[in-house]
A protein has these predicted regions:
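Leucine-rich, highly hydrophobic segment in Treponema pallidum outer-membrane-associated proteins
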Residues: 5-6, 19-178, 211, 215-218, ...
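Extracellular/lumenal glycan-associated surfaces
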Residues: 231-241, 297-306, 422-424
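Hydrophobic or amphipathic alpha-helical targeting/insertion segments
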Residues: 1-19
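Long, K/E/R/D-enriched contiguous segments that form extended
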Residues: 158-272
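Short loop/beta submotifs within extracellular cysteine-rich repeat domains
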Residues: 2-4, 81, 243-244, 306-309
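Conserved RecA-like P-loop NTPase helicase motor core
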Residues: 1, 287-303
Length: 433
């Protein structure tokens, strides 16, 4: 490996070959020379830039008019496994199953990052290089292009909004075919019936899989007032038949009636989990989970408070993310960067809300009292308490200007899945659509 690196560093093939030969021949015994005849070469001698997979990756992950990325990460996972498992029988046996599983369709994965380029504060690209046609486990990834507009129940002051479109029936069928192939025919159906359907009191395939519409919405936000366990998640799955989804939920709740408490907010009825938390969690419980069916979605999450904010956003009593100018600005930039592309995945993050959470925690009386009680013998806590007492923390508005929102998408290409993510420089005006 060192020989190959030096060869390219020097830039002269003739000189590099001589240097390589002298490097290789130094201190080689007769026994080592004889053994080397039967040892296959580890390196092809080609530069990485001549690798067709790397060339394909870089073509997708670097815009032609941009300078070279500040960071490039590239890996061939199967190749790495093959090299590291050269003398490992277990790895060799596992790799022998890769063609049947379709794992050998994963050719490479790479990532590039460029800082302060063009209109962007940071611009990142990712590419998952897949073979064609995709087979086996690669077909489990059943992401599909579709609508990524935030539904009306997505409120604007969340930390992250993620959404994607997925063919659940296709994924389920692929998993069933793979499991049955390596175990026995009907293994998956037996497991689903005995371990899921009978336990939940429903037909999992008919009532759940076949009623999923394919749209997934994931919201991450913070409860108010700020607390250490305030970050909570809400997941929403679109359904084909809302009435059928409501009946499925009612069947499940009836089976475990003692575990739920019915609640109502506005015109929405939902189920709150009844959990007896240990004493140490009663004042600050980790979660307050719920289940609900609303507006063509099945929703579940870790905070009733955040769900009620979602209802309020749907009803128009608090701002919605889709109407937020910062979100609209980044959505326009995405359209300009990849015109005509319909993503399979979309993410939007507001680091301002993360910063607000920790700022509110640090400045709350409860946190100040905690730090004061535990500052003795702790230089960091002591310095923090002294800074807050001296009023050295700047106003939140000063800090917030350095927390720009960011956006990221993933879309399907002929060579695999490509992702792009960025945040904009300060004071960048929206591009004309």
């Amino acid at each position: 490996l060192l020989s190959e690196v030096l060869k390219r560093w020097q830039g002269s093939d003739d000189d590099a070959a001589a240097a390589s030969a002298s490097f290789d021949d130094a201190d080689v015994t007769a026994e080592e020379e004889e053994a080397s005849v039967d040892t296959p070469p580890q390196y092809s001698g080609r530069a990485l830039a001549e690798n067709s997979q790397f060339v394909t990756f870089l073509r997708h992950c670097r815009r032609p008019h941009d300078p070279p990325p500040n960071l490039v990460v590239y890996a061939d996972p199967i190749g790495l496994l093959r090299e590291f498992g050269r003398d490992n029988t277990g790895i060799k046996i596992a790799m022998a199953t890769f063609p049947a599983l379709g794992v050998d369709g994963l050719h490479a994965v790479g990532f590039t990052s460029t800082v302060a380029v063009d209109r962007f504060d940071g611009l990142n690209h990712m590419h998952l290089l897949l073979g064609n046609p995709r087979a086996g486990v690669m077909q489990v990834i059943a992401a599909e292009p579709g609508d990524t507009t935030p539904p009306p129940f997505v409120f604007d002051d969340l930390e992250s909004y993620l959404t994607w479109n997925w063919n659940f029936r296709s994924s389920f069928n692929t998993i069933r075919a793979l499991v049955d192939r390596f175990q026995f025919e009907g293994r998956t159906d037996r497991f689903v019936k005995e371990s899921i359907s009978e336990r939940l009191g429903l037909d999992f395939e008919k009532d759940v899989i076949d009623n999923l519409g394919g749209r997934v919405v994931w919201m991450i936000g913070y409860e108010q007032p700020a607390r250490f366990r305030g970050q909570q998640n809400t997941l929403a799955l679109s359904v084909v038949d809302e009435d059928a989804a409501a009946r499925t939920l009612a069947t499940f709740v009836a089976k475990y009636a003692d575990k739920f408490e019915e609640r109502r907010f506005g015109d929405v009825t939902y189920q709150r989990f009844k959990i007896e938390w240990p004493e140490q969690f009663q004042e600050d419980p980790p979660t307050d989970p719920f289940l609900a069916v609303m507006d063509g979605y099945f929703l579940f999450g870790g905070s009733c408070q955040l769900f009620e904010r979602a209802i309020a956003a749907r009803d128009g009593t608090i701002p919605r993310l889709a109407d937020d100018p910062a979100y609209q600005h980044l959505a326009i930039e995405v359209e300009q960067e990849v015109p005509g592309v319909t993503p399979v995945f979309w993410s939007y993050s507001r680091s301002e809300e993360t910063l607000r959470q920790w700022y509110d925690l640090l400045t709350s009386p409860k946190t100040r009292d905690f730090l004061a009680e535990h500052s003795e013998g702790n230089p960091f806590f002591t310095a923090l308490v002294e800074s807050m007492e001296a009023g050295e923390l700047p106003p939140f508005e000063v800090l917030a200007q350095y927390a720009a929102p960011s956006v990221g998408i993933i879309y399907d290409t002929d060579s695999g899945y490509h992702g792009i993510g960025f945040s904009l420089r300060a004071n960048v005006e929206p591009t004309s659509p």
